[in-house]
Amino acid sequence: ILNVLYNNVLQINPNNFSSTDRNRYVHSKGHTVEALYTVLCDQNFFSKKDLNSLNKFNSHFIGHPTRKVPGIEHNTGALGHGLSVAVGMAIGFKLDNKPYKVYTLLGDGELSEGSIWESLLSASKYNLDNLVIIIDRNGLQITGKTEEVNPIEPLLDKFQSFGLCVKQVNGNSVSELDEVFKEIPFENN
């Protein structure tokens, strides 16, 4: 998912990262930040040598996203807050009449957090067609399987009930991801 986003979709790189005129990416699924570090390294935000300090004392490369790492948009880690930040960014773009999009990756385990559902209410109210929410539906969270800990199905129906356009693809398929991202903005049927 991250490779497709950074290589084919976001158009974010070290040369334009400090610009306000660009798309945004919020990594809400903070515990998978190592995957994001790898992609950011491949995009030349920092060197592979920098990654040698991962999770070491005084390192900026810790177990959750921090803005101290080049290419990280927002600190995340507390479950469910990334979507709230992404919604706020998307509203800001709308208010400023900016054409940019905000993409955010959520883990299905964090869908148990109330702030997710509050954010969806706002996304629906403000018709945020510039917000792309990606859910990694792997069925797991820290204490077990999502459907055993706190069931979230029928997930598609829940998101559609907010008036959101929902697409389901295989997140391991580059071609499916490429295709669905090319369809943005989606037509809400």
State where each predicted segment sits.
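Thiamine diphosphate
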Residues: 56-68, 89-91, 95-100, 120-189
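Cofactor-binding active-site loop characterized by glycine-rich and histidine/acidic residues
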Residues: 2-125
